UniProtKB/Swiss-Prot annotation:
Compartments, record wording: Secreted
Cystine residue pairs: 169-217, 262-310, 354-394
Any one GO BP annotation for this protein: female pregnancy
Domain Ig-like C2-type, residue spans: 147-234, 237-327, 332-410
Major subcellular site: secreted
Keywords: Disulfide bond, Glycoprotein, Immunoglobulin domain, Repeat, Secreted, Signal
Pfam families: Ig_2, Ig_3, V-set
Organism lineage: Eukaryota, Metazoa, Chordata, Craniata, Vertebrata
SUPFAM superfamilies linked: Immunoglobulin
Protein's name according to its UniProt entry: Pregnancy-specific beta-1-glycoprotein 4
GO cellular component: extracellular region
Length: 419
């Protein structure tokens, strides 16, 4: 059988996609016949055009042949088959409507797409001739001629030594390998430069001026290679981490005025203050000079302990300080005595406890009818009698704030017994 040319293309299609190239793989060389080969015509085909998978040197006495997509002869890879007797054509599950098989076993693929790239298997069956028949498999691979790649970046303006960058070589190309270049040299592997499993993605950790680029990526397959235009990262100056200075870390509630200062000072920065992870809202209580680097908090309360952070920003981004939390001294508040009931019977046990909000913890003392009894939060008198009736007072004191407070209850003890 002579070669069969693919039908001429009557419409000219401008190539915008990927060229497809056939690489030839030769198989099965029976001793009395010429070598069977498969080639693509044309050798390079544009996406949207037609390609003929032309078969040479078919053996004689054929019963038929089957084309499969891929290297496996599974049913769902079955494209089409040709039966010599009756010249019948049968289509399989992998038939797309664009394939046409000829009597010489050649396969025409029309309107080629990128999905058509890859391996094809021709299954040849000879008639039974006393030896049970002969079956041969012939495989070739249709490669994508690599397009010119481009590099996409997660961040073209990284902060020096502070930010990571992810570079990706586009497009994703089947059956191709990826290679990266930096400063015109093959990419060195360091702890700052790491590649993905496919090499298509490059991770740059903590970009410095020495690894800012230019970067290029290359897409390569067995028939071609293409390199991208260079991409250089615009390295931004490093922002030094700010810190907060404060005139008093242990202010007294409603008494001390606090002044926070965000360091360092620079005309190139914008300053932002944060409280409890939220941007500090404008409030009449909070005073901020026009540059916002200083924060003045008069009459601090226990609800304003923080944490506080300051942030410095330039037009590309910002960085926050470590948090600062205040130790606001307060109290003691008016104490509470538990339990609150005041009537007891003779012989009962008396247990009283006292509590007052205070920072640091308050000192407690008890008096009965003005006479000191003990120091501590709890007062216990077993088997009380009527002589224990009187005014019980809990006094609390905070040595840090210098404040004192007290609470009293009247306890009445009776010999009266319920019937």
């Amino acid at each position: 059988m002579g070669p069969l040319s693919a039908p001429p293309c009557t419409q000219r299609i401008t190539w915008k996609g990927v060229l497809l190239t056939a690489s030839l793989l030769n198989f099965w060389n029976p001793p009395t016949t010429a070598q069977v080969t498969i080639e693509a015509q044309p050798p390079k085909v544009s996406e949207g055009k037609d390609v003929l998978l032309l078969v040479h040197n078919l053996p004689q006495n054929l019963a038929g042949y089957i084309w499969y997509k891929g290297q496996m002869t599974y049913l769902y890879h079955y494209i089409t088959s040709y039966v010599v007797d009756g010249q019948r054509i049968i289509y399989g599950p992998a038939y797309s409507g664009r394939e046409r098989v000829y009597s010489n076993a050649s396969l025409l693929i029309q309107n080629v797409t990128q999905e058509d790239a890859g391996s094809y298997t021709l299954h040849i069956i000879k008639r039974r001739d006393g030896t049970g028949g002969v079956t041969g498999h012939f495989t070739f691979t249709l490669h994508l001629e690599t397009p010119k790649p481009s590099i996409s970046s997660s961040n073209l303006n990284p902060r020096e030594a502070m930010e990571a960058v992810i570079l990706t070589c586009d497009p994703a190309t089947p059956a191709a390998s990826y290679q990266w270049w930096m400063n015109g040299q093959s990419l060195p592997m360091t702890h700052r430069l790491q590649l993905s499993k496919t090499n298509r993605t490059l991770f740059i950790f903590g970009v410095t001026k020495y690894i800012a680029g230019p970067y290029e990526c290359e897409i390569r397959n067995p028939v071609s290679a293409s390199r991208s235009d260079p991409v250089t990262l615009n390295l931004l100056p490093k922002l030094s981490k700010p810190y907060i200075t404060i005139n008093n870390l242990n202010p007294r509630e409603n008494k001390d005025v606090l002044t926070f200062t965000c360091e360092p000072k620079s005309k190139n920065y914008t300053y932002i203050w944060w409280l409890n992870g939220q941007s500090l809202p404008v409030s009449p209580r909070v005073k901020r000079p026009i540059e916002n680097r200083i924060l003045i908090l008069p009459n601090v309360t226990r609800n304003e302990t923080g944490p506080y952070q300051c942030e410095i920003r330039d037009r590309y981004g910002g960085i926050r300080s470590d948090p600062v939390t205040l130790n606001v001294l307060y109290g003691p508040d008016l104490p509470s005595i538990y339990p609150s009931f005041t009537y007891y019977r003779s012989g009962e046990n008396l247990y009283l406890s006292c509590f007052a909000e205070s920072n640091p913890r308050a000192q407690y003392s008890w008096t009965i009818n003005g006479k000191f009894q003990l120091s501590g939060q709890k007062l216990s008198i077993p088997q009380i009698t009527t002589k224990h009736s009187g005014l019980y007072a809990c006094s609390v004191r905070n040595s840090a704030t210098g404040k004192e407070s007290s609470k009293s209850i009247t306890v009445k003890v009776s010999d009266w017994i319920l019937p």
